[in-house]
Design a protein with these regions (language model features):
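A mature extracytoplasmic/lumenal domain signature
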Residues: 50-52, 83, 93-95, 105-109, ...
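Hydrophobic ligand-binding cavity/cleft-lining segments
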Residues: 21-70
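C-terminal segment of classical bacterial N-terminal signal peptides
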Residues: 14-22
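Hydrophobic pocket/interface hotspot
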Residues: 46-50, 56, 77, 91, ...
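Bacterial N-terminal signal peptides that target proteins for export
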Residues: 1-9
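A short, structured loop/turn motif at beta-sheet edges
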Residues: 40-44, 92-100, 123-134, 176-182
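Beta-strand/loop substructures that line and gate deep hydrophobic ligand-binding cavities in soluble
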Residues: 108-165
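Short beta-edge strand/loop motif at the mouth of beta-sheet-based domains
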Residues: 53-89, 96-98
Length: 182
């Protein structure tokens, strides 16, 4: 009897790893969004509108901006949104010759923008015909909730939708501003 009980226990120990469900990955993965828009203006004109890190007046979601150190590396800015939410950012790379700069968010409430560990680059490129510009805005980030089973407003889809909305809204407003001459 003891021998058969031992055999059953040994079989259970051997079979357990084979019957256990596979371990699942946990936590969020880094997401990326890239949006581009063609603007009927030369790159220099477009860069003149967006090349100053301290000036986000072209973006309709920004009602106020304040910052320090212009467009120097480690310059900071605080963007205030219509709902009084704020986003604090720091400039990490700036290349006027390549018409590009990169920045990252240092502080934001996930209720304002449902992301964490956000970094972004905005670049102005010549259009195919030489008379237009392509503006590319790309970012990488994690969702606003770092653990498994995030609430809907802080999941991957919410983060991607929010960043996509920021980029599309900004790029469309930039195009309208430049092409209308305002």
């Amino acid at each position: 009897m003891l021998k058969s009980l031992f055999a059953v226990a040994l079989a259970a120990v051997i079979a357990a790893p084979l019957l256990a469900p596979p371990a699942e990955a946990h936590g969020p993965t880094r997401k990326k969004v890239t949006e581009t828009i063609e603007i009927n203006a030369p790159p220099e004109k477009v860069w003149a509108a967006i090349g100053n890190f301290q000036d986000m007046s072209w973006h309709p979601a920004v009602v106020k901006q304040e910052g320090q150190n212009g467009s120097a590396i480690d310059a900071t800015r605080r963007l205030t949104l219509p709902n009084d939410g704020t986003i604090d950012e720091v400039l990490v790379k700036y290349d006027a010759a390549k018409m590009s700069y990169s920045y990252r968010i240092t502080a934001v409430d996930v209720k304002v923008l449902p992301v964490t560990n956000y970094s972004s680059t905005i670049t102005v490129l010549p259009g195919a015909d030489g008379k237009t510009s392509m503006v590319e805005w790309r970012g990488a980030f994690y969702r606003g909730y770092p653990n498994n089973d995030p609430p809907a407003e802080l999941n991957d889809d919410a983060a991607i939708a929010a960043v996509t909305g920021v980029y599309k809204g900004g790029l469309e407003a930039l195009k309208k501003k430049i092409e209308s001459g305002s």
